[in-house]
A protein has these predicted regions:
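Conserved acidic donor-binding segment of nucleotide-sugar-dependent glycosyltransferases
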Residues: 309-310, 314-321, 330-336
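A conserved, positively charged/aromatic
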Residues: 74, 113-142, 159
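Carbohydrate-associated surface elements
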Residues: 149, 171
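A short helix/loop element that forms part of the nucleotide-sugar donor recognition site in Leloir-type
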Residues: 175-188, 194, 245
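Aromatic "clamp/platform" in nucleotide-sugar-dependent glycosyltransferases that forms part
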Residues: 258, 277
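Short His-centered aromatic/hydrophobic patch
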Residues: 93-101, 117
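A conserved mid-protein helix/loop that constitutes part of the nucleotide-sugar donor-binding site
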Residues: 19-30, 193, 197-219, 228, ...
C-alpha cells in the first residue's frame, strides 16, 4: 500500500445530480488531490450526467457504473473489476446504496471501507434497508455521520454505540458573489427585500412552508414587496407554481431551477431561508454563513449544531409557517440584527466549517482504516 499522502481513494456516489452531497464530493476530491492523494470518483453513468461532467471539468477521470435494479450483480462485478484496475487503497462510500455496494466490493477486494451518511431518509420505515445498512456498517473500517443528530439515529438503527460512529461536519471552500446581475435578471429592485432558498424541490426541503410564510408575511404592508427566489429543481415545482398562482404570489416567487451561481444569489439576498423538514448539515446553510447573510432555518437534524438561535441565526420549528413568517419579518425589519447574526455566522463558519477542517478529519479516518487493514 502507498504511504498516507499517496493513498488512492475511491469516492463512490449513488447520485449524479447537482445537490449538496455531490457538491461536497467535488470539494473533497479536489482537496484530497491537493494533499497528494490519488482520487478515483465512481459515479452513475445513466443519470443526468452533471457529476461526471463536473469531475471531468476538474481534470478527474470518473469511473461510471449503471445500476438497472436494486440488486444488480452485473453492476457489482463491474465495480469490482474497475476498482481492482484502478488499484484503490480505500473505498469511501456516500449514502445508503453505495454503502451497501461498497461493502461488497471492499470485501471482495480486501480493501478498507469507509461509509459517510449524509441523511437519514434512507432507512426510515424500511426494515430491509436497515438490515442492509447494519451489515455494511458492521464490516466497515469506519462509519461517519455528518452531524451528531444523525449519529444518534444511526446508532439506534445500526445497534451500535454512538462512539462507534464518528461525527465529521461538512465543510466548504467559500466563494464570493456579485449581487447586481441576479436582481436585474429577476426584475427585483435594490430596495425590494429578497429571501433566497437553495435546495432541490422535494417535500423534505419544505419550500411550500416558505411560500405559506411569504403569503402571511405579505399581509403586512411593510413587506408587500418581498420576493422569494428558490434555486433547485424537482418534483414539487408544479405544486409550488400552483400555490403561488392560487394566492397571487406569482410575481413574487421565482423558481430558478438549477443554478451554478449560488454565490451571486446569496450576494443578492437580504435573507437566506432553510425551511427543511429534515437535514444533515446542509451545504447551502454553510454557503449562507460564509456569505454573512441573515439566516432563518428549521431547527432540524444537524442545523442546531451549526448555528445557535439568536447568535448566528433565527431557528424555528419545522412545518410552522407562522413561526417562519415571524422570523423573516424580524430579519427584514431589523438591519442591525441581520448584520449581527450574519457576522457571527461568518466567523463561526471560518472557525469550524472549512473544507480543510473536514478533509483533516477524513485523512485521519483513512489513516486509521489503512492501519486496520
Amino acid at each position: 500500500m502507498n504511504q498516507q499522502s499517496g493513498l488512492s481513494i475511491a469516492l463512490l456516489s449513488e447520485s449524479d445530480g447537482p445537490a449538496g452531497a455531490e457538491k461536497l464530493l467535488l470539494q473533497l476530491a479536489e482537496t484530497l488531490r491537493e494533499r497528494g492523494y490519488a482520487v478515483c470518483p465512481v459515479v452513475p453513468g445513466n443519470g443526468c450526467g452533471w457529476l461526471p461532467a463536473e469531475f471531468r471539468r476538474r481534470a478527474f477521470t470518473p469511473e461510471l457504473f449503471v445500476m438497472r435494479r436494486p440488486v444488480d450483480w452485473r453492476c457489482l462485478l463491474g465495480l469490482v473489476h474497475t476498482l481492482r484496475r484502478r488499484r484503490v487503497d480505500v473505498l469511501h462510500s456516500h449514502d445508503f446504496t453505495m454503502a451497501v455496494y461498497g461493502a461488497a466490493v471492499a470485501g471482495i477486494l480486501r480493501r478498507p471501507h469507509v461509509i459517510t451518511m449524509h441523511g437519514g431518509r434512507y432507512f426510515a420505515g424500511r426494515w430491509s434497508r436497515r438490515v442492509a445498512l447494519r451489515a455494511a456498517a458492521g464490516h466497515a473500517a469506519a462509519a461517519v455521520a455528518v452531524s451528531a443528530a444523525l449519529q444518534a439515529d444511526l446508532a439506534t438503527v445500526l445497534r451500535l454505540p454512538r462512539a462507534a460512529i464518528r461525527v465529521l461536519h461538512n465543510g466548504i471552500r467559500p466563494a464570493v458573489g456579485s449581487p447586481n446581475g441576479v436582481r436585474r435578471e429577476l426584475g427585483i429592485g435594490a430596495e425590494e427585500p429578497l429571501i433566497v432558498a437553495i435546495g432541490n424541490l422535494y417535500p423534505v426541503k419544505g419550500h411550500l412552508v416558505l411560500l405559506q410564510a411569504l403569503r402571511a408575511l405579505r399581509e403586512d404592508p411593510a413587506f408587500a414587496r418581498c420576493h422569494v427566489a428558490i434555486a433547485g429543481r424537482g418534483e414539487e415545482e408544479t405544486a409550488l407554481r400552483a400555490y403561488a398562482a392560487e394566492h397571487a404570489l406569482t410575481q413574487h416567487v421565482h423558481l430558478l431551477g438549477y443554478r451554478a451561481d449560488v454565490p451571486d444569489l446569496l450576494a443578492a439576498a437580504d435573507i437566506f431561508a432553510l425551511p427543511s423538514r429534515s437535514e444533515g448539515v446542509p451545504l447551502a446553510l454553510l454557503e449562507a454563513m460564509f456569505a454573512g447573510k441573515g439566516i432563518t432555518a428549521s431547527a432540524v437534524g444537524g442545523v442546531p449544531e451549526v448555528v445557535t438561535s439568536e447568535r448566528e441565526a433565527l431557528l424555528v420549528p419545522s412545518e410552522d409557517p407562522p413561526s417562519l413568517a415571524t422570523a423573516l419579518g424580524r430579519l427584514l425589519e431589523d438591519a442591525a440584527l441581520r448584520l449581527r447574526l450574519g457576522d457571527a455566522a461568518r466567523r463561526r463558519a471560518e472557525r469550524e466549517f472549512t473544507v480543510d477542517t473536514m478533509v483533516d478529519g477524513y485523512m485521519s479516518v483513512y489513516a486509521n482504516a489503512v492501519g486496520r487493514a
